[in-house]
């Protein structure tokens, strides 16, 4: 009888636990559903056009969806073709967004459903983390405060990488926390693999995930090394992360470095953000917290934590000395990773307000603990019912303030007649592939916005912004057909752009098609090349001549790539490349040593980021040349770009057995030593100490002494 009674009691307890879990999950679903309903309502009322970054991310998602073959008129072109679509930013978020677009639609509001999915995952992750730290109440309340946070509410409706990055980093840190816990709770293979996959996924969304994940990962890894099972798990986890990153990084590492430099170093300097050594860096983000988290949410949280510290003020010194021993389990980890993320983000040269987003969920967990501490104190003073009523009132007030702030940000007009311009072009061009040129950089009229809008709803229009250089004016006029110009302020103060606008209006080759009223007494004008004007000259013959100029060495590189850069603006589809490739292959069928064709194909492969194929063409040029030339130098360079460093070192040794001029020999010695160093050959770093300076001097001599 006693045993049956005990079994019955255990069954009742299990049923209660299941019921509580159901209520907990239903609460999270309700939180997500209510916040998503508000977001969709906000999006349906806000009519603004996607601006610079938003439009660029939408275009990237569109391209990746087409690259997967999920969106028309795209098709699957292999892994390399897919990796070509993400030269500067990792592709995971764009791949997910493009896949969701295939279901929801390509328009920005419909594509934003992917943000709701990221938001749901963030709610669950934060709630589970809170539940581990302080039970169900902490988890649910953290989810509520997350939804009410003004910054997170903004990220939920702004199509960018901020919400995907925040979600992936929070998930990675939570799974890393679970794995680093003492056995048998932590330290399992499943936890290690899950943490590794989540870290890899976060890095494949944006490189800046390193700011939040690098130090915690190193911290956990160092703690795991003395423990044999965890040491093996650490090695396997590192292998998993590298395996996820390497395909994209190997394909795009050069453009990634260049893009990161512009986005972080150059952009931060232009915006006047404090440098790494500037003390203002450390208070840059804390001063934004009232606006980011909400003044009431932050005040109550800090008050609760401050009250707890005051009540335990005699133990503060011991707490500072031994936080791991004094604080409840899990809280030292949360505080540690929050501080690491805040410090690393503060030290980044570019300090846009949204870059602190991955740290906000962890701050919200800490603030939520302060809320619960206030509730506990209130229960002792005024009773349980009144304290919970006060909590609900504070949540409602916070919700009202958050909704008020977001509602005031709604824009009920598009901001510019950009869609009307694109519809007119699409109608007149009969849906054919079209490039639209412009000089303006207004929030509602810029190349990113027009390019995205020009690629949806059956349109096939790309927009490009010209006028950065006065020398390009004549080339721009000679090779363009469609222009969109504006009167008044166009968001740019460069005289070269203003002069280009006037040149289009005065050029007899162009005619005004239509005008639209804009705001502030401005107008938008659509100009088209007259049918009677001379035909646009193709770039094919000029490209062949430029490619042959590679024979002249480093002196030719800058003018070659400068001209190709402007041509890629004029021809964003790179249509000339297919024509040149067809021409070159036909020439080689009749003459296998045709130098124009060989150099053209080699340069094409370099521009297409196919270093392996470029190497084959440079070797072909070497084999048919009567004497040694710069093709050998280029071959080593593309092999290094392809990470085939050992092969490059071996080839350089062979090249040095032949006769080269002094400048070529200096470069060969430096490239050989660089290849050896990258191949972990100790002779490499030693040799670079003496070979690097002569190589640089030879390049400078070539540039200063020769011209194409």
Regions found by a protein language model. Give the residues of each.
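Signature aromatic-anchored transmembrane alpha helix within multi-pass, membrane-resident enzymes
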Residues: 4, 28, 242, 318, ...
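Extracytosolic helix-loop segments that constitute the early lumenal/periplasmic catalytic or substrate-binding loops
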Residues: 37-44, 55-85, 92-95, 257
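Transmembrane-lumen/periplasm boundary regions of multi-pass, lipid-linked membrane glycan transferases
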Residues: 57-63, 67, 201, 205, ...
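Short acidic/glycine- and proline-prone juxtamembrane loop motifs at membrane-interface regions
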Residues: 112, 151-165, 352-353
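Transmembrane-helix motifs of polytopic, lipid-linked glycan transferases
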Residues: 110-133, 171, 175, 308-311
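Membrane-interface transmembrane helices that cradle and orient dolichyl/undecaprenyl
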Residues: 133, 172-192, 202, 374
């Amino acid at each position: 009888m006693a045993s049956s009674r005990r079994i019955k009691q255990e069954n009742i307890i299990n049923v209660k636990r299941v019921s509580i879990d159901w209520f907990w999950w239903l609460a999270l679903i309700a939180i997500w559903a209510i916040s998503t309903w508000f977001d969709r309502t906000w999006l349906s009322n806000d009519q603004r056009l996607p601006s610079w970054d938003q439009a660029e991310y939408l275009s990237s998602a569109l391209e990746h969806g087409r690259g997967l073959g999920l969106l028309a008129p795209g098709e699957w072109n292999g892994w390399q073709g897919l990796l070509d679509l993400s030269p500067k930013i990792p592709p995971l978020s764009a791949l997910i967004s493009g896949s969701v677009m295939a279901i929801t639609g390509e328009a920005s509001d419909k594509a934003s459903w992917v943000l709701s999915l990221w938001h749901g995952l963030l709610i669950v992750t934060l709630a589970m983390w809170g539940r581990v730290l302080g039970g169900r109440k902490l988890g649910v309340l953290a989810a509520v405060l997350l939804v009410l946070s003004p910054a997170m509410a903004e990220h939920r409706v702004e199509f960018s990488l901020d919400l995907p990055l925040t979600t992936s980093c929070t998930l990675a840190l939570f799974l890393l926390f679970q794995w680093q816990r003492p056995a048998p709770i932590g330290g399992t293979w499943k936890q290690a693999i899950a943490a590794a996959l989540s870290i890899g996924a976060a890095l494949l969304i944006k490189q800046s995930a390193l700011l939040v994940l690098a130090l915690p990962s190193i911290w956990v890894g160092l703690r795991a090394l003395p423990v044999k099972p965890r040491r093996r798990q650490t090695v396997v986890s590192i292998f998993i992360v590298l395996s996820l990153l390497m395909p994209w990084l190997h394909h795009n590492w050069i453009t990634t470095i260049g893009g990161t430099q512009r986005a972080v170093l150059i952009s931060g300097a232009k915006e006047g953000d404090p440098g790494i050594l500037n003390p203002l860096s450390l208070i840059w983000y804390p001063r934004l917290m009232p606006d980011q988290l909400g003044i009431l949410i932050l005040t109550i949280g800090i008050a609760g934590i401050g009250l707890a510290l005051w009540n335990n003020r005699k133990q503060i010194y011991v707490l500072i000395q031994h936080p791991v021993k004094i604080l409840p389990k899990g809280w030292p980890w949360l505080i540690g990773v929050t501080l690491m993320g805040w410090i690393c983000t503060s030290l980044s040269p570019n300090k846009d307000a949204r870059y602190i987003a991955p740290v906000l969920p962890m701050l919200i967990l800490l603030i939520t603990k302060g809320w619960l501490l206030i509730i506990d104190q209130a229960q002792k003073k005024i009773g349980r019912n009144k304290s919970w009523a006060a909590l609900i009132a504070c949540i409602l007030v916070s919700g009202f303030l958050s909704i008020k702030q977001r509602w005031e940000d709604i824009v009920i007009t598009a901001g510019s007649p950009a869609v009307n311009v694109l519809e007119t072009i699409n109608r007149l061009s009969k849906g054919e592939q079209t490039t639209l040129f412009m000089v303006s950089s207004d929030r509602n009229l810029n190349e990113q916005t027009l390019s995205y809008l020009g690629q949806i709803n059956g349109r096939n229009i790309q927009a490009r912004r010209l006028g950065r250089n006065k020398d390009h004016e004549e080339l721009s006029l000679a090779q363009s057909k469609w222009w969109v110009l504006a009167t008044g302020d166009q968001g740019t103060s460069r005289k070269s752009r203003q002069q280009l606008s006037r040149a289009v209006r005065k050029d007899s080759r162009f005619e005004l098609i239509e005008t639209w009223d804009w705001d502030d007494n401005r107008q938008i004008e659509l100009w088209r090349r007259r049918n009677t004007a001379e035909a646009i000259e193709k770039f094919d013959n000029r490209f062949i001549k430029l490619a042959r100029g590679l024979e002249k060495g480093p002196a030719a590189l800058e003018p070659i790539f400068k001209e190709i850069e402007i041509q890629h603006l004029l021809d964003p589809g790179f249509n000339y490349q297919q024509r040149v490739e067809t021409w070159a292959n036909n020439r080689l069928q009749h003459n296998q040593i045709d130098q124009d064709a060989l150099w053209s194909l080699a340069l094409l492969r370099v521009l297409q980021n196919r270093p392996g194929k470029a190497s084959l063409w440079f070797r072909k040029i070497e084999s048919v040349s009567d004497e040694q030339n710069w093709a050998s130098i280029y071959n080593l360079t593309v092999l290094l770009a392809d990470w085939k460093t050992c092969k490059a070192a071996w080839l350089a040794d062979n090249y040095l057995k032949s006769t080269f001029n002094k400048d070529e020999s200096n470069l060969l010695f430096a490239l050989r030593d660089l290849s050896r160093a990258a191949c972990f050959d100790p002779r490499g770093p030693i040799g670079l100490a003496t070979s690097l300076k002569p190589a640089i001097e030879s390049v400078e001599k070539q540039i200063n002494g020769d011209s194409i």
